[in-house]
């Protein structure tokens, strides 16, 4: 197995905004329902949202005294809006502002010799256990209801763990990343005895079926999926040569399988997309005697920028964008420490904030979710 599978660098996920209609004491609050049939909110997320610092959702409009009249008014408004839309074209409502939600991360649990998943507010408060150990290469679904593991899915409360068939045409299927709509997974496929099958495969997230091959490494190495683009058209991944623990950054077209190298001669350990799809962020490979760093680059390889963590760090890796695109979350070991905590900083490397402080624990798999309201 490659080093990628050993350290499980793939916790990527994003929440989708949802809301539920409510009727309380005969009053109707008009709300927008973005996702039908939403899953029950897990206890850890409810605890994070109940904090006084959390943003309070506001109802739209004044409560009406009669539910019947309220429903008639709502129906009339919908008819009027539809009529205007038919005569003047589509109506575009202003997009709701993106609010940064909880940061999720993995923490190594020595007693289990494996990983447990935690969530914490962006200010470092309210840490909650999400899934106890053992869990391998977890990655949260876009709707926040499930976590992909190797190779399967489990609900965020730990129930209904489904393990999928983990082989396909000779390839063992391992760590994965979600498509933006939550329907598909991009999965690493590998076979140390037959490296011709090494590459990335796509599979249904519901049952692991409908498997198709996306990439072929072709150099006896491994293709490791990092992140799916927000528009669902591309998968960013790390391509490593045989026997190497690092690789170069690539992007593959989901429809055609065509892949291009983003940055020649720049090797990395992890790659992810910004939420607007305009940038890739990657960990530059660790080189003995040199400080680690992050890079920002356009998906076509242009506008390459280097971001340096604080000068006193031992090593840093796993950067991921905040939902609003203004900050990066990552794991970093400071000074002579060999165990990492979670930090955030602005995308220019300034305003570094320590989120966790656990000197005896190693933390990784950093992911930053959208506030789900």
List the model feature ranges, each with a label.
Residues 1-5, 9, 21, 33-108, ...:
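Membrane-interface helical sensory segment of bacterial ECF anti-sigma factor regulators
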Residues 17-18:
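Extended, charge-rich low-complexity interaction segments
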Residues 93-96, 132-150, 168-188, 218-238, ...:
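Conserved beta-propeller blade repeats
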Residues 102, 108-128, 150-165, 184, ...:
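Beta-propeller blade-edge and WD-like acidic-aromatic loop motif
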């Amino acid at each position: 197995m490659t080093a990628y599978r050993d350290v499980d660098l793939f916790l990527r996920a994003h929440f989708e905004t949802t809301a539920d209609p409510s009727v309380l004491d005969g009053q109707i609050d008009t709300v927008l329902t973005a996702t039908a049939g939403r899953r029950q909110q897990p206890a850890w997320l409810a605890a994070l949202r109940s904090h006084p610092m959390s943003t309070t959702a506001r109802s739209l409009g004044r409560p009406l005294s009669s539910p019947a009249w309220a429903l008639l008014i709502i129906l009339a408004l919908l008819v009027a809006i539809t009529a205007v839309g038919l005569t003047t074209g589509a109506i575009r409502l202003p997009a709701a502002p993106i609010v940064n939600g909880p940061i999720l991360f993995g923490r190594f649990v020595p007693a289990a010799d494996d990983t447990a998943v935690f969530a914490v507010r962006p200010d470092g408060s309210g840490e909650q256990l999400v899934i106890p150990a053992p869990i391998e290469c977890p990655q949260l679904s876009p709707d926040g209801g499930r976590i992909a593991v190797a190779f399967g899915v489990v609900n965020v409360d730990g129930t209904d763990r489904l393990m999928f068939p983990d082989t396909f045409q000779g390839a063992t299927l391992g760590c994965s990343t979600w498509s933006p709509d939550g329907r598909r997974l991009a999965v690493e496929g590998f076979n140390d005895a037959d490296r011709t099958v090494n590459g990335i495969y796509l599979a249904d997230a519901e049952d692991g079926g409908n498997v198709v091959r996306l990439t072929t490494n072709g150099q006896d190495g491994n293709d490791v999926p990092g992140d799916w683009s927000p528009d669902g058209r591309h998968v960013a991944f790390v391509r490593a040569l045989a026997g190497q623990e690092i690789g170069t950054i690539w992007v593959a077209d989901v429809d055609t399988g065509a892949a291009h190298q983003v940055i020649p001669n720049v090797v990395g350990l992890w790659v992810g997309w910004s939420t607007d799809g305009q940038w890739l962020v990657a960990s530059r490979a660790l080189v003995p005697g040199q400080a680690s760093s992050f890079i920002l680059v356009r998906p076509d390889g242009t506008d390459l920028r280097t971001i340096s963590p604080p000068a006193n760090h031992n090593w840093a890796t796993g950067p991921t964008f905040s939902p609003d695109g203004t900050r990066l979350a990552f794991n970093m070991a400071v000074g002579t420490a060999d165990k990492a905590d979670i930090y955030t900083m602005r995308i220019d490397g300034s305003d570094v904030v320590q989120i966790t402080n656990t000197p005896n624990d190693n933390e990784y798999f950093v992911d930053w979710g959208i506030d789900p309201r």
